[in-house]
From Swiss-Prot:
Family matches, as Gene3D superfamilies: Vaccinia Virus protein VP39
Domain PABS stretches: 6-252
Primary role: Catalyzes the irreversible transfer of a propylamine group from the amino donor S-adenosylmethioninamine (decarboxy-AdoMet) to putrescine (1,4-diaminobutane) to yield spermidine.
Gene Ontology biological process terms in this record: spermidine biosynthetic process
Record-level GO cellular component terms: cytoplasm
Catalytic activity: S-adenosyl 3-(methylsulfanyl)propylamine + putrescine = S-methyl-5'-thioadenosine + spermidine + H(+)
Protein name (Swiss-Prot/TrEMBL): Polyamine aminopropyltransferase
Pfam families from the UniProt entry: Spermine_synth (PF01564)
Domain of life: Bacteria
Keywords recorded for this protein, A-Z: Cytoplasm, Polyamine biosynthesis, Spermidine biosynthesis, Transferase
Main location: cytoplasm
Localisation: Cytoplasm
Amino acid sequence: MSINPIVLLFALLCTLLSPFSIGQSTIIHEQKSLYQDIVVFEHQDFRCLSFTAKKGERVQTCEYQDPQDKRIYFPYVRMTLAGLLFNPKPERILIIGLGGGSVPSALAELYPESHMDIVEIDPVVSQIAERYFYFQPSHNTRVHTGDARVYIKRAGLKGQKYDFILLDAFNGEYIPEHLMTREFLMETKQLLSSSGVLVANTFSTSKLYDHESATYRSVFGEFYNFKIPQESGNRVILSMLTSLPNQQALQQQAEALASALQPFAIEIENYPSLMTLEADWDEQARLLTDQFSPANLLK
């Protein structure tokens, strides 16, 4: 007896998303793109997006079905807005990786006059974000379909600068190796404005950790390492061109931002105490470069 691959996918998906169960969830859309299989499903008051690529592993983003509910569901997604502690009034924003559009939507509401560029390699993801996750680009937002490395190189040649850069193109299934190298980070660094902040959503539990950390340190010098205990294994790297603010300054800024971020379920006043400048990696680890970047073997 043959097994319907969609049924099998759904069963595996629900197992990975415990406590969501197959009896309580409903697939509302599934589509194969050039890069991955994409599933949208609903569970109670959530709607979730799942990507499936080479090895059957998945990364999910979930949002509340009520379009008036602004809360960001996953803690690791909320963590990326810690970058606002370093630049609370970004006028130009660059986001690499769209997903369901939770972070761009939040930033667009917080800063309606700011210009935002979003780079997403998969056009199907952009379509699904708009159709199922209430992502509506404003007149100040442009979604660019293409490879982020190419976009950043071209932006650098044009002399473009950004106050807030978010690297969020990685997932548990596949890491774009060319977006982790020292050369790529140098190109990205050139796009930062004098007060700009780089935010990288990445992993804290992999063999890649030492190499990635050493590579970021080689390009940016000191950076804040932000982890939430007992969370998904994600971490957020935060750095700037200028000297980094101390813990006291971060806490003061968190208190100033707290009320604005409360509708998104971001308890930013708790974030500074979870950030550290201390190196907890092998500082002699080999740097990731365009010639050496075995990211998917090391994860």
